Design a protein with these regions (language model features):
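Conserved glycine-bearing catalytic or ligand-binding loops at nucleotide- and phosphate-handling centers
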Residues: 146-168
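Short, surface-exposed helix/turn micro-motifs that flank interaction/cofactor sites
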Residues: 6-7, 23, 148, 156
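Conserved SAM/AdoMet-binding glycine-rich loop
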Residues: 13-140
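Canonical Radical SAM [4Fe-4S] cluster-binding loop centered on the CxxxCxxC motif
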Residues: 1-3
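Hydrophobic pocket-lining residues that define ligand/cofactor binding sites across diverse proteins
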Residues: 12-13, 147
């Protein structure tokens, strides 16, 4: 629950902790299970109000869940690092669909453009999966072209490996 997270953050701040890193499998959907709606923007506002916390970093924000409201909070709250770990996994529409992702190349480009327009100094990190079953040389080249065009500041690339319960 949010109150427990806020209490833990307050306790950490009182112990001298300066940075909070919010990380979950899908950080951007925080609150859906408990409150039946996304609560990350509210949580961020409330964490930023805690004295002693200097900066907050967000990890694992899937692009399809990054909302204009979240971007606005990141823009307004000075304690939130202009750094976003946004795992896109691939950029080929065909492979994204096979992976079960809920986005496509155009939506990825639109989201990145929105982030860079609203937060010009944002640092974007992403992770990619290569060798996904059925990936062709054309899919791979498309991904290389996408990465070159976007110019991510940080990039992690991993070979496909089967993981129970997920296609990717």
């Amino acid at each position: 629950p949010m109150e427990r997270l806020l209490k833990e953050a307050q306790d950490l701040a009182e112990q001298g902790v300066k940075e909070l890193i919010l990380v979950a499998q899908e950080t951007t959907v925080y609150g859906i299970d408990l409150y039946k709606k996304k609560m990350l923007p509210e949580l961020l506002h409330r964490l930023c109000a805690i004295p002693g916390i200097v900066w907050i970093r967000l990890l694992y924000c899937y692009p399809e869940e990054i909302t204009p409201e979240l971007v606005q909070v990141m823009k307004e709250e000075k304690k939130i690092c202009h750094y976003l770990d946004m795992p896109i996994q691939h950029s080929s529409d065909r492979i994204l669909k096979k992976m079960g992702r809920r986005t496509n190349r155009k939506e990825l480009l639109d989201k990145i453009e929105m982030l860079r327009t609203e937060i010009p100094d944002i640092v974007l990190r992403t992770t990619l999966i290569t060798g996904f079953p059925g990936e062709t040389q054309e899919d791979f080249e498309e991904m290389l072209s996408f990465v070159d065009m976007v110019g991510f500041e940080r990039l992690g690339v991993f070979p496909y490996s089967p993981e129970e319960g997920t296609p990717a």
